[in-house]
Structures are given as C-alpha cells and as structure tokens.
C-alpha cells in the first residue's frame, strides 16, 4: 500500500477555552482541559493513522476547522493558542515530526 500525504482527523470537541490567551484560569484547570483535549485528538489521530500507510511528515501544512453553533466573529489568534494541546497530540501520535514554525504552517 503506498504512503499517503493527506490525513483528515475529525475531533468532536472544541479546543479548550482555558488555552485562550484571554483566559484567566488556575494552571491545574488549564492543564486538565489541555490533557483531555490532547487525549481526544491523539485517539482520533491514531485511529486515522492506522487506517492508512502513514509516515510522519517532517514538513506539513495543518488546517484546523472549528465549527461553532452560533455565528459570531472569532479571533484566529485565540483559536491558534487553543489548539496547542491538539498540535502536541499530533506529534505524539506520529502524524507530524515537529510542531515548530520552521516545519509547520497552520491555518485556523
């Protein structure tokens, strides 16, 4: 089976609001929320990875699509920060090798 270079991972949970730069929460609550979301992303990523012949990408473009129930204008910077535990989970799951700015371009 040939290796694929595109993977769609759907997570039925919003990134944690505790990771927003505007959030004022206790560090333990932030950690708990990040761990929960990261574990959800990790599980979905591993499931998607195991269905195909996936090799971790050194350079990647990550597109994050967040769907909300109500239509309001949202700040992209906040959502980029909120996705931090999800990006870390993609590295842990072996989807991407690195999550720094030299190896990843991200669009939220």
Predicted regions: what they are:
Residues 1-108:
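Catalytic phosphate/metal-binding cores of nucleic-acid and nucleotide-processing enzymes, i.e., regions
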């Amino acid at each position: 089976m040939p290796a694929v270079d595109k993977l769609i991972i759907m997570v039925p949970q919003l990134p944690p609001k505790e990771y927003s730069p505007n959030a004022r929460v206790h560090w333990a609550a932030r950690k708990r929320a990040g761990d929960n979301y990261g574990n959800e992303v990790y599980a979905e990523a591993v499931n998607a990875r195991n269905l195909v012949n996936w090799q971790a990408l050194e350079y990647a473009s990550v597109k994050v699509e967040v769907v909300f129930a109500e239509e309001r204008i949202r700040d992209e910077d906040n959502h980029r920060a909120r996705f931090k535990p999800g990006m870390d989970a993609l590295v842990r799951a072996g989807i991407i090798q690195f999550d720094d700015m030299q190896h990843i371009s991200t669009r939220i």
